[in-house]
Amino acid sequence: MILDVPLPGIEPWEEVKANPVLWHVGFHQTPNVPEKLLAGRQFVNFREGIFHRFTANSRSITDADVTHYVKSYAAPTQLRAGMEFYRPFPANEKFNKEQQSPVDVPIVLAGGDKAFGQLIPRMAESLRKNGCTHVTTEVIKDSGHYVVGEQPTIVAELIERYASI
């Protein structure tokens, strides 16, 4: 299950990359800089820079939730690991664009209706064109990017529904 993220190299990836709202992707890919600028500022980064901007209802993520994220990224190695999620995107983009072999593994694309959920049909079509034979889509209502925090019951139900496919 892929939850509310665009996939590098899978359409509409070029559109996603060009979206100025997603400036943080390039920032996080920059070696060493985000770690230095964000160290000690994780709470403000998560509360104002991330959750306030990318949730349908920023109050769905409490200060206690933010504190949990802050603790998870408190150590320099943890903060670096968080940035490393973004750094292979260029290589992933190249790989995914070149992928044409059949892929029979079931894929469930799910996204928040106020975030990447609107791109899900185009992503599914692109995956099918690239050889993925079993793609299912779901749009999670009243949710932004942080679908697990915003709609935990719905996400749990989706996982239970699709876990056996």
Question: Which residues make up each language-model segment?
Answer:
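Flexible "cap/lid" subdomain of the alpha/beta-hydrolase fold that forms the substrate-access gate
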Residues: 1-139, 156, 160, 164
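Catalytic histidine-centered segment of alpha/beta-hydrolase-like enzymes
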Residues: 143-156
